[in-house]
Amino acid sequence: MALMILPFIGSVSVSESLVALTAVCLVYLILKFFRTEIPAGLRQLPGPKPLPIIGNVLEVGSKPHLSLTAMSKRYGDVFQIQIGMRPVVVLSGSETVRQALIKQGDEFSGRPDLYSFTFINDGKSLAFSTDQAGVCGACRKLAYSALRSFSTLDGTTPEYSCMLEEHICKEGECLINQLNTVMKADGSFDPFRHIVVSVANVICGMCFGRRYDHNDQDLLRLVNLSDEFGQVAGSGNPADFINILRFLPSTTMKKFMTINADFNTFVKKIVGEHYATFDKNNIRDITDSLIDHCEDRKLDENCNVQMSDEKIVGIVNDLFGAGFDTVSTALSWSVMYLVAYPDIQERLFQEIKDNVGLDRTPLLSDRSKVPYLEAFILELFRHSSFLPFTIPHCSAKDTSLNGYFIPKDTCVFINQWQINRDPELWKDPSSFNPDRFLSCNGTEVNKQEGEKVMVFGMGKRRCIGEVIARNEVYRGLAILIQRLQFHEMPGELLDMTPEYGLTMKHKRCHLRATMRARNEQ
Protein backbone atom coordinates (compact mmCIF):
# COMPACT_ATOMS: atom_id res chain seq x y z
CA MET A 1 0.00 0.00 0.00
CA ALA A 2 1.02 3.55 -0.50
CA LEU A 3 0.47 7.15 0.61
CA MET A 4 -2.98 8.14 -0.61
CA ILE A 5 -3.42 11.63 0.77
CA LEU A 6 -0.81 13.69 -1.07
CA PRO A 7 -0.94 15.76 -3.10
CA PHE A 8 -4.34 17.39 -3.11
CA ILE A 9 -3.45 20.69 -4.74
CA GLY A 10 -5.83 21.30 -7.61
CA SER A 11 -8.48 18.89 -6.33
CA VAL A 12 -10.38 21.64 -4.48
CA SER A 13 -12.92 23.70 -6.40
CA VAL A 14 -13.03 27.49 -6.09
CA SER A 15 -16.28 27.38 -4.13
CA GLU A 16 -14.88 24.78 -1.74
CA SER A 17 -11.78 26.90 -1.22
CA LEU A 18 -13.75 30.06 -0.47
CA VAL A 19 -16.08 28.36 1.98
CA ALA A 20 -13.17 26.60 3.67
CA LEU A 21 -11.25 29.85 3.90
CA THR A 22 -14.15 31.63 5.56
CA ALA A 23 -14.89 28.77 7.93
CA VAL A 24 -11.39 28.08 9.17
CA CYS A 25 -9.83 31.54 9.30
CA LEU A 26 -11.24 32.13 12.76
CA VAL A 27 -10.15 28.66 13.86
CA TYR A 28 -6.63 29.31 12.62
CA LEU A 29 -6.39 32.68 14.36
CA ILE A 30 -7.40 31.04 17.62
CA LEU A 31 -5.21 27.96 17.27
CA LYS A 32 -2.07 29.87 16.40
CA PHE A 33 -2.01 31.26 19.93
CA PHE A 34 -1.92 27.78 21.38
CA ARG A 35 1.34 25.87 21.25
CA THR A 36 1.97 22.32 22.36
CA GLU A 37 3.89 22.32 25.59
CA ILE A 38 7.22 20.56 25.07
CA PRO A 39 8.30 18.33 28.01
CA ALA A 40 11.62 19.15 29.63
CA GLY A 41 14.60 17.58 27.88
CA LEU A 42 12.86 17.29 24.50
CA ARG A 43 12.98 19.55 21.47
CA GLN A 44 10.29 21.03 19.26
CA LEU A 45 10.00 19.46 15.82
CA PRO A 46 11.81 21.39 13.07
CA GLY A 47 10.21 22.07 9.71
CA PRO A 48 9.11 24.71 7.21
CA LYS A 49 6.80 27.47 8.41
CA PRO A 50 3.21 26.78 7.28
CA LEU A 51 0.95 29.27 5.57
CA PRO A 52 -2.50 29.97 7.02
CA ILE A 53 -5.17 27.46 6.03
CA ILE A 54 -3.18 25.56 3.38
CA GLY A 55 -0.10 24.82 5.46
CA ASN A 56 2.88 23.60 3.41
CA VAL A 57 1.04 22.18 0.40
CA LEU A 58 2.78 24.56 -1.99
CA GLU A 59 6.20 23.32 -0.87
CA VAL A 60 5.10 19.68 -0.97
CA GLY A 61 3.85 20.06 -4.53
CA SER A 62 2.85 17.28 -6.90
CA LYS A 63 5.84 15.02 -6.19
CA PRO A 64 5.88 14.66 -2.39
CA HIS A 65 8.43 11.83 -2.39
CA LEU A 66 10.97 14.23 -3.90
CA SER A 67 10.03 17.38 -2.00
CA LEU A 68 9.91 15.63 1.39
CA THR A 69 13.25 13.95 0.67
CA ALA A 70 14.73 17.36 -0.09
CA MET A 71 13.28 18.70 3.17
CA SER A 72 14.86 15.84 5.12
CA LYS A 73 18.29 17.03 3.95
CA ARG A 74 17.56 20.41 5.51
CA TYR A 75 15.61 19.47 8.64
CA GLY A 76 16.82 15.93 9.37
CA ASP A 77 15.17 12.53 9.64
CA VAL A 78 12.35 13.80 11.87
CA PHE A 79 10.54 17.00 10.92
CA GLN A 80 7.04 18.43 10.75
CA ILE A 81 4.97 19.90 7.94
CA GLN A 82 1.37 21.03 7.90
CA ILE A 83 -1.15 19.80 5.35
CA GLY A 84 -4.18 22.06 5.50
CA MET A 85 -4.87 22.36 9.22
CA ARG A 86 -3.29 19.03 10.18
CA PRO A 87 0.29 18.72 11.47
CA VAL A 88 2.18 15.81 9.93
CA VAL A 89 5.50 14.34 11.09
CA VAL A 90 7.71 12.99 8.29
CA LEU A 91 10.18 10.21 9.08
CA SER A 92 13.19 9.46 6.88
CA GLY A 93 16.39 7.46 7.33
CA SER A 94 16.54 3.71 7.80
CA GLU A 95 17.61 3.76 11.45
CA THR A 96 15.05 6.40 12.44
CA VAL A 97 12.19 4.52 10.77
CA ARG A 98 13.33 1.23 12.29
CA GLN A 99 13.45 2.88 15.72
CA ALA A 100 9.91 4.19 15.30
CA LEU A 101 8.19 1.17 13.74
CA ILE A 102 10.02 -1.68 15.48
CA LYS A 103 11.69 -0.56 18.70
CA GLN A 104 8.86 1.89 19.45
CA GLY A 105 6.28 -0.03 17.45
CA ASP A 106 3.44 0.28 19.97
CA GLU A 107 3.82 4.06 19.94
CA PHE A 108 3.69 4.46 16.15
CA SER A 109 1.36 1.65 15.04
CA GLY A 110 -1.82 3.71 14.94
CA ARG A 111 -3.63 5.08 11.90
CA PRO A 112 -4.83 8.70 11.64
CA ASP A 113 -8.59 9.21 11.69
CA LEU A 114 -8.74 10.50 8.13
CA TYR A 115 -12.22 11.00 6.75
CA SER A 116 -11.58 9.02 3.56
CA PHE A 117 -10.44 5.96 5.54
CA THR A 118 -13.97 5.46 6.90
CA PHE A 119 -15.26 4.58 3.43
CA ILE A 120 -12.69 1.90 2.63
CA ASN A 121 -14.25 -1.52 3.23
CA ASP A 122 -17.11 0.25 5.05
CA GLY A 123 -14.60 1.30 7.70
CA LYS A 124 -13.61 -2.31 8.40
CA SER A 125 -10.28 -2.31 6.57
CA LEU A 126 -7.35 -3.98 8.31
CA ALA A 127 -4.86 -1.72 6.59
CA PHE A 128 -6.62 1.60 7.21
CA SER A 129 -8.35 0.97 10.55
CA THR A 130 -7.50 3.27 13.47
CA ASP A 131 -8.02 0.29 15.81
CA GLN A 132 -4.56 -1.23 16.31
CA ALA A 133 -5.61 -3.79 18.92
CA GLY A 134 -9.07 -5.15 19.69
CA VAL A 135 -11.03 -6.25 16.66
CA CYS A 136 -8.36 -5.10 14.19
CA GLY A 137 -5.66 -7.08 15.99
CA ALA A 138 -7.90 -10.14 16.02
CA CYS A 139 -8.60 -9.75 12.31
CA ARG A 140 -4.89 -9.54 11.51
CA LYS A 141 -4.29 -12.78 13.42
CA LEU A 142 -7.13 -14.39 11.51
CA ALA A 143 -5.78 -13.16 8.19
CA TYR A 144 -2.28 -14.46 8.96
CA SER A 145 -3.68 -17.85 9.95
CA ALA A 146 -5.79 -18.07 6.80
CA LEU A 147 -2.87 -17.09 4.58
CA ARG A 148 -0.60 -19.68 6.20
CA SER A 149 -3.22 -22.37 5.75
CA PHE A 150 -3.86 -21.44 2.13
CA SER A 151 -0.15 -21.24 1.27
CA THR A 152 0.33 -24.84 2.43
CA LEU A 153 -2.63 -26.31 0.52
CA ASP A 154 -1.50 -28.95 -1.96
CA GLY A 155 -1.83 -28.26 -5.67
CA THR A 156 -4.08 -30.44 -7.81
CA THR A 157 -1.02 -32.23 -9.25
CA PRO A 158 2.39 -33.18 -7.76
CA GLU A 159 4.00 -30.74 -10.20
CA TYR A 160 3.14 -27.82 -7.91
CA SER A 161 4.28 -27.43 -4.32
CA CYS A 162 1.10 -25.60 -3.32
CA MET A 163 -2.13 -24.16 -4.68
CA LEU A 164 -0.61 -20.68 -4.80
CA GLU A 165 2.13 -21.88 -7.13
CA GLU A 166 -0.43 -23.63 -9.32
CA HIS A 167 -2.50 -20.44 -9.70
CA ILE A 168 0.56 -18.36 -10.62
CA CYS A 169 1.97 -20.95 -13.02
CA LYS A 170 -1.25 -21.54 -14.96
CA GLU A 171 -2.00 -17.84 -15.25
CA GLY A 172 1.59 -17.22 -16.36
CA GLU A 173 1.07 -19.61 -19.27
CA CYS A 174 -2.15 -17.81 -20.18
CA LEU A 175 -0.35 -14.46 -20.13
CA ILE A 176 2.42 -15.78 -22.40
CA ASN A 177 -0.17 -17.05 -24.89
CA GLN A 178 -2.13 -13.80 -24.70
CA LEU A 179 0.96 -11.66 -25.38
CA ASN A 180 1.98 -13.93 -28.26
CA THR A 181 -1.49 -13.58 -29.79
CA VAL A 182 -1.50 -9.80 -29.40
CA MET A 183 1.99 -9.52 -30.91
CA LYS A 184 0.95 -11.52 -33.97
CA ALA A 185 -2.15 -9.38 -34.43
CA ASP A 186 -0.88 -5.90 -33.54
CA GLY A 187 2.92 -6.07 -33.47
CA SER A 188 3.09 -4.49 -30.02
CA PHE A 189 1.45 -4.65 -26.60
CA ASP A 190 0.71 -2.45 -23.60
CA PRO A 191 2.55 -4.18 -20.71
CA PHE A 192 0.38 -2.76 -17.95
CA ARG A 193 -2.92 -3.61 -19.68
CA HIS A 194 -2.17 -7.33 -19.97
CA ILE A 195 -0.17 -7.80 -16.77
CA VAL A 196 -2.83 -6.15 -14.62
CA VAL A 197 -5.53 -8.50 -15.93
CA SER A 198 -3.31 -11.53 -15.41
CA VAL A 199 -2.47 -10.53 -11.83
CA ALA A 200 -6.14 -9.87 -11.11
CA ASN A 201 -6.87 -13.42 -12.22
CA VAL A 202 -4.24 -14.83 -9.86
CA ILE A 203 -5.71 -12.85 -6.96
CA CYS A 204 -9.22 -13.99 -7.92
CA GLY A 205 -7.99 -17.57 -7.93
CA MET A 206 -6.39 -17.22 -4.50
CA CYS A 207 -9.24 -15.27 -2.88
CA PHE A 208 -12.28 -16.59 -4.73
CA GLY A 209 -11.21 -19.91 -6.24
CA ARG A 210 -12.15 -18.93 -9.78
CA ARG A 211 -10.46 -17.82 -12.98
CA TYR A 212 -11.88 -15.45 -15.58
CA ASP A 213 -11.28 -15.04 -19.29
CA HIS A 214 -9.11 -12.00 -20.01
CA ASN A 215 -12.08 -10.28 -21.67
CA ASP A 216 -14.61 -11.26 -19.01
CA GLN A 217 -16.69 -8.22 -18.03
CA ASP A 218 -16.69 -9.04 -14.31
CA LEU A 219 -12.90 -9.26 -14.28
CA LEU A 220 -12.48 -6.06 -16.28
CA ARG A 221 -14.91 -4.34 -13.93
CA LEU A 222 -12.69 -5.32 -10.99
CA VAL A 223 -9.61 -4.03 -12.80
CA ASN A 224 -11.34 -0.76 -13.63
CA LEU A 225 -12.56 -0.32 -10.04
CA SER A 226 -9.03 -0.78 -8.74
CA ASP A 227 -7.65 1.65 -11.30
CA GLU A 228 -10.31 4.24 -10.45
CA PHE A 229 -9.61 3.78 -6.74
CA GLY A 230 -5.92 4.48 -7.31
CA GLN A 231 -6.63 7.57 -9.40
CA VAL A 232 -9.13 9.08 -6.96
CA ALA A 233 -7.19 8.16 -3.82
CA GLY A 234 -3.90 9.26 -5.31
CA SER A 235 -5.25 12.75 -5.99
CA GLY A 236 -5.97 13.16 -2.27
CA ASN A 237 -9.02 14.22 -0.31
CA PRO A 238 -8.96 17.78 1.07
CA ALA A 239 -11.59 16.85 3.66
CA ASP A 240 -8.92 14.77 5.40
CA PHE A 241 -7.16 18.01 6.32
CA ILE A 242 -9.84 20.69 6.33
CA ASN A 243 -12.72 19.32 8.38
CA ILE A 244 -15.37 21.74 7.16
CA LEU A 245 -15.08 20.25 3.66
CA ARG A 246 -16.61 17.02 4.94
CA PHE A 247 -19.98 18.74 4.98
CA LEU A 248 -19.78 20.19 1.48
CA PRO A 249 -20.73 18.43 -1.77
CA SER A 250 -17.73 16.86 -3.49
CA THR A 251 -17.86 14.96 -6.77
CA THR A 252 -14.46 13.41 -6.04
CA MET A 253 -15.55 12.12 -2.64
CA LYS A 254 -18.83 10.85 -4.06
CA LYS A 255 -16.92 8.89 -6.70
CA PHE A 256 -14.56 7.51 -4.04
CA MET A 257 -17.52 6.30 -1.96
CA THR A 258 -19.17 4.72 -5.01
CA ILE A 259 -16.01 2.84 -6.00
CA ASN A 260 -15.65 1.37 -2.51
CA ALA A 261 -19.34 0.48 -2.31
CA ASP A 262 -19.27 -1.28 -5.69
CA PHE A 263 -16.24 -3.37 -4.75
CA ASN A 264 -17.74 -4.26 -1.37
CA THR A 265 -20.91 -5.41 -3.11
CA PHE A 266 -18.89 -7.66 -5.41
CA VAL A 267 -16.93 -9.23 -2.54
CA LYS A 268 -20.04 -9.65 -0.34
CA LYS A 269 -21.73 -11.62 -3.11
CA ILE A 270 -18.79 -14.01 -3.46
CA VAL A 271 -18.36 -14.45 0.31
CA GLY A 272 -22.07 -15.25 0.53
CA GLU A 273 -21.68 -17.91 -2.16
CA HIS A 274 -18.74 -19.38 -0.23
CA TYR A 275 -20.78 -19.64 2.96
CA ALA A 276 -23.54 -21.43 1.03
CA THR A 277 -21.14 -24.01 -0.43
CA PHE A 278 -18.56 -24.21 2.37
CA ASP A 279 -17.08 -27.65 3.06
CA LYS A 280 -14.60 -27.87 5.92
CA ASN A 281 -12.97 -30.87 4.23
CA ASN A 282 -12.50 -29.04 0.92
CA ILE A 283 -10.82 -25.65 1.42
CA ARG A 284 -10.81 -24.06 -2.03
CA ASP A 285 -9.27 -20.63 -1.47
CA ILE A 286 -8.45 -17.89 1.04
CA THR A 287 -12.13 -17.07 1.59
CA ASP A 288 -12.82 -20.68 2.57
CA SER A 289 -9.77 -20.62 4.82
CA LEU A 290 -11.07 -17.49 6.57
CA ILE A 291 -14.47 -19.07 7.09
CA ASP A 292 -12.83 -22.22 8.40
CA HIS A 293 -10.79 -20.26 10.95
CA CYS A 294 -13.79 -18.48 12.41
CA GLU A 295 -16.75 -20.84 12.06
CA ASP A 296 -17.54 -20.34 15.72
CA ARG A 297 -17.02 -16.56 15.31
CA LYS A 298 -14.07 -16.63 17.72
CA LEU A 299 -10.37 -16.78 17.00
CA ASP A 300 -9.59 -18.99 19.99
CA GLU A 301 -10.89 -20.03 23.37
CA ASN A 302 -9.40 -17.01 25.12
CA CYS A 303 -10.63 -14.38 22.64
CA ASN A 304 -13.91 -12.60 23.20
CA VAL A 305 -13.88 -10.84 19.84
CA GLN A 306 -16.80 -11.95 17.69
CA MET A 307 -15.96 -12.33 13.99
CA SER A 308 -18.82 -11.19 11.75
CA ASP A 309 -19.37 -11.93 8.08
CA GLU A 310 -18.64 -8.26 7.40
CA LYS A 311 -15.17 -8.63 8.90
CA ILE A 312 -14.42 -11.52 6.56
CA VAL A 313 -15.57 -9.37 3.63
CA GLY A 314 -13.23 -6.63 4.85
CA ILE A 315 -10.25 -8.98 5.10
CA VAL A 316 -10.84 -10.42 1.62
CA ASN A 317 -11.26 -6.90 0.27
CA ASP A 318 -7.94 -5.83 1.82
CA LEU A 319 -6.06 -8.88 0.56
CA PHE A 320 -7.38 -8.45 -2.96
CA GLY A 321 -6.73 -4.73 -3.15
CA ALA A 322 -3.23 -4.79 -1.69
CA GLY A 323 -2.00 -7.84 -3.59
CA PHE A 324 -3.50 -6.79 -6.88
CA ASP A 325 -2.09 -3.27 -7.17
CA THR A 326 1.33 -4.03 -5.67
CA VAL A 327 2.07 -7.12 -7.76
CA SER A 328 0.74 -5.76 -11.06
CA THR A 329 2.76 -2.55 -10.64
CA ALA A 330 5.91 -4.50 -9.72
CA LEU A 331 5.65 -6.82 -12.74
CA SER A 332 4.86 -3.98 -15.12
CA TRP A 333 7.90 -2.04 -13.91
CA SER A 334 9.95 -5.25 -14.24
CA VAL A 335 9.23 -5.45 -17.95
CA MET A 336 10.19 -1.79 -18.35
CA TYR A 337 13.55 -2.42 -16.65
CA LEU A 338 14.16 -5.51 -18.81
CA VAL A 339 13.69 -3.38 -21.91
CA ALA A 340 15.78 -0.51 -20.54
CA TYR A 341 18.68 -2.86 -19.69
CA PRO A 342 18.88 -5.56 -22.41
CA ASP A 343 22.21 -6.90 -21.10
CA ILE A 344 20.61 -7.55 -17.71
CA GLN A 345 17.63 -9.19 -19.43
CA GLU A 346 19.94 -11.56 -21.29
CA ARG A 347 21.92 -12.38 -18.14
CA LEU A 348 18.68 -13.24 -16.33
CA PHE A 349 17.61 -15.51 -19.18
CA GLN A 350 20.95 -17.31 -19.20
CA GLU A 351 20.75 -17.87 -15.44
CA ILE A 352 17.32 -19.46 -15.78
CA LYS A 353 18.38 -21.53 -18.80
CA ASP A 354 21.53 -22.81 -17.07
CA ASN A 355 20.03 -23.54 -13.64
CA VAL A 356 16.37 -24.34 -14.30
CA GLY A 357 16.23 -25.22 -17.97
CA LEU A 358 13.76 -24.32 -20.69
CA ASP A 359 11.64 -27.47 -20.72
CA ARG A 360 9.66 -26.63 -17.56
CA THR A 361 8.47 -23.50 -15.81
CA PRO A 362 10.52 -22.16 -12.87
CA LEU A 363 9.11 -23.16 -9.48
CA LEU A 364 9.29 -21.65 -6.01
CA SER A 365 11.80 -24.35 -5.12
CA ASP A 366 14.15 -22.97 -7.81
CA ARG A 367 14.64 -19.59 -6.11
CA SER A 368 18.00 -20.50 -4.59
CA LYS A 369 19.23 -21.47 -8.07
CA VAL A 370 18.63 -18.02 -9.55
CA PRO A 371 20.25 -15.47 -7.18
CA TYR A 372 20.64 -12.86 -9.91
CA LEU A 373 16.87 -12.89 -10.48
CA GLU A 374 16.34 -12.41 -6.75
CA ALA A 375 18.83 -9.53 -6.81
CA PHE A 376 17.04 -8.02 -9.81
CA ILE A 377 13.73 -8.03 -7.93
CA LEU A 378 15.31 -6.37 -4.89
CA GLU A 379 16.88 -3.70 -7.10
CA LEU A 380 13.55 -3.23 -8.86
CA PHE A 381 11.87 -2.58 -5.51
CA ARG A 382 14.65 -0.22 -4.43
CA HIS A 383 15.23 1.74 -7.62
CA SER A 384 11.60 2.21 -8.69
CA SER A 385 10.37 2.56 -5.10
CA PHE A 386 6.89 2.49 -6.60
CA LEU A 387 5.43 2.50 -3.08
CA PRO A 388 7.05 5.79 -2.03
CA PHE A 389 5.23 6.00 1.30
CA THR A 390 3.55 3.53 3.61
CA ILE A 391 -0.05 4.07 4.56
CA PRO A 392 0.13 6.94 7.08
CA HIS A 393 0.84 6.00 10.68
CA CYS A 394 -0.24 7.82 13.83
CA SER A 395 1.29 8.25 17.27
CA ALA A 396 -0.74 6.23 19.77
CA LYS A 397 0.37 8.39 22.70
CA ASP A 398 2.64 11.29 23.59
CA THR A 399 6.12 10.09 22.67
CA SER A 400 9.53 11.19 21.43
CA LEU A 401 11.86 10.21 18.62
CA ASN A 402 15.47 11.30 18.14
CA GLY A 403 14.97 13.77 20.98
CA TYR A 404 11.89 15.44 19.45
CA PHE A 405 8.50 15.52 21.15
CA ILE A 406 5.61 14.02 19.15
CA PRO A 407 2.11 14.51 20.63
CA LYS A 408 -0.54 11.79 20.65
CA ASP A 409 -2.66 11.39 17.50
CA THR A 410 -0.07 13.02 15.23
CA CYS A 411 -0.20 11.82 11.61
CA VAL A 412 3.13 10.27 10.57
CA PHE A 413 4.44 9.78 7.02
CA ILE A 414 7.12 7.13 6.38
CA ASN A 415 9.24 8.13 3.37
CA GLN A 416 10.23 4.78 1.85
CA TRP A 417 11.51 6.48 -1.31
CA GLN A 418 14.11 8.41 0.68
CA ILE A 419 15.35 5.24 2.38
CA ASN A 420 15.64 3.39 -0.93
CA ARG A 421 17.57 6.28 -2.52
CA ASP A 422 19.65 7.33 0.51
CA PRO A 423 23.32 7.85 -0.55
CA GLU A 424 24.40 7.07 3.01
CA LEU A 425 22.81 3.64 2.67
CA TRP A 426 23.51 2.83 -0.99
CA LYS A 427 26.51 3.33 -3.25
CA ASP A 428 25.48 5.30 -6.35
CA PRO A 429 21.75 5.01 -5.46
CA SER A 430 20.47 6.47 -8.74
CA SER A 431 22.02 3.67 -10.83
CA PHE A 432 20.19 0.39 -11.48
CA ASN A 433 22.58 -2.36 -10.39
CA PRO A 434 21.25 -5.76 -9.22
CA ASP A 435 24.81 -6.87 -8.39
CA ARG A 436 24.74 -4.69 -5.27
CA PHE A 437 22.62 -7.43 -3.64
CA LEU A 438 24.86 -10.38 -4.52
CA SER A 439 27.57 -11.90 -2.35
CA CYS A 440 31.22 -11.48 -3.35
CA ASN A 441 31.22 -14.65 -5.45
CA GLY A 442 27.80 -13.89 -6.93
CA THR A 443 26.27 -17.22 -5.92
CA GLU A 444 23.74 -15.98 -3.38
CA VAL A 445 21.83 -12.91 -2.26
CA ASN A 446 23.32 -10.82 0.52
CA LYS A 447 20.40 -10.96 2.96
CA GLN A 448 21.71 -8.09 5.04
CA GLU A 449 21.67 -5.79 2.02
CA GLY A 450 18.26 -7.06 0.94
CA GLU A 451 16.73 -6.22 4.30
CA LYS A 452 17.63 -2.56 3.79
CA VAL A 453 15.09 -2.24 0.98
CA MET A 454 11.79 -0.86 2.23
CA VAL A 455 8.70 -1.64 0.21
CA PHE A 456 6.14 -3.39 2.44
CA GLY A 457 6.59 -1.27 5.56
CA MET A 458 7.79 -2.79 8.81
CA GLY A 459 6.70 -3.50 12.35
CA LYS A 460 3.14 -4.10 13.54
CA ARG A 461 1.58 -2.62 10.40
CA ARG A 462 3.77 -4.51 7.91
CA CYS A 463 1.84 -5.76 4.88
CA ILE A 464 0.22 -9.09 5.79
CA GLY A 465 0.41 -10.34 2.20
CA GLU A 466 4.12 -9.64 1.73
CA VAL A 467 5.23 -13.27 1.38
CA ILE A 468 2.55 -14.08 -1.18
CA ALA A 469 3.32 -10.87 -3.11
CA ARG A 470 7.06 -11.62 -3.24
CA ASN A 471 6.36 -15.17 -4.41
CA GLU A 472 4.00 -13.97 -7.10
CA VAL A 473 6.45 -11.38 -8.42
CA TYR A 474 9.25 -13.98 -8.53
CA ARG A 475 7.17 -16.64 -10.29
CA GLY A 476 5.52 -14.26 -12.73
CA LEU A 477 8.79 -12.60 -13.70
CA ALA A 478 10.68 -15.89 -14.02
CA ILE A 479 8.10 -17.22 -16.49
CA LEU A 480 8.16 -14.03 -18.56
CA ILE A 481 11.96 -13.99 -18.79
CA GLN A 482 12.15 -17.69 -19.63
CA ARG A 483 9.59 -17.56 -22.44
CA LEU A 484 9.78 -14.05 -23.91
CA GLN A 485 12.35 -11.48 -24.96
CA PHE A 486 11.19 -7.87 -24.60
CA HIS A 487 12.21 -4.93 -26.81
CA GLU A 488 11.36 -1.25 -27.13
CA MET A 489 9.48 -0.02 -30.17
CA PRO A 490 11.75 1.08 -33.05
CA GLY A 491 12.28 4.82 -33.06
CA GLU A 492 10.64 5.35 -29.65
CA LEU A 493 12.43 6.33 -26.46
CA LEU A 494 11.53 4.45 -23.30
CA ASP A 495 10.19 6.84 -20.66
CA MET A 496 10.96 5.56 -17.15
CA THR A 497 9.66 8.67 -15.38
CA PRO A 498 7.22 7.56 -12.65
CA GLU A 499 3.80 9.16 -12.29
CA TYR A 500 2.96 9.90 -8.67
CA GLY A 501 -0.13 8.22 -7.27
CA LEU A 502 -1.32 5.59 -4.84
CA THR A 503 1.43 3.52 -6.38
CA MET A 504 3.89 5.15 -8.77
CA LYS A 505 3.38 3.69 -12.23
CA HIS A 506 5.30 4.20 -15.44
CA LYS A 507 3.67 6.02 -18.31
CA ARG A 508 1.53 3.81 -20.52
CA CYS A 509 3.43 2.68 -23.59
CA HIS A 510 3.74 -0.11 -26.14
CA LEU A 511 6.57 -2.65 -26.35
CA ARG A 512 7.51 -5.64 -28.48
CA ALA A 513 8.00 -9.24 -27.37
CA THR A 514 9.29 -12.31 -29.19
CA MET A 515 8.89 -15.92 -28.11
CA ARG A 516 12.11 -17.68 -27.13
CA ALA A 517 12.70 -21.11 -28.61
CA ARG A 518 12.60 -23.95 -26.09
CA ASN A 519 15.96 -25.18 -27.37
CA GLU A 520 17.54 -21.71 -27.49
CA GLN A 521 21.27 -21.72 -26.89
UniProtKB/Swiss-Prot annotation:
It is a peripheral membrane protein. GO terms for biological process: hormone biosynthetic process; progesterone metabolic process. Its cofactor is heme. Substrate binds at F229. Its main location: endoplasmic reticulum. Heme binds at C463. GO terms for molecular function: heme binding; iron ion binding; steroid 17-alpha-monooxygenase activity. CDD domains: CYP1A (cd20676). GO terms for cellular component: endoplasmic reticulum membrane. Its EC number is 1.14.14.1. Cytochromes P450 are a group of heme-thiolate monooxygenases. They oxidize a variety of structurally unrelated compounds, including steroids, fatty acids, and xenobiotics. Belongs to the cytochrome P450 family. This is Cytochrome P450 1A1. It comes from Chaetodon capistratus. The lineage of its organism: Eukaryota, Metazoa, Chordata, Craniata, Vertebrata. The gene is cyp1a1.
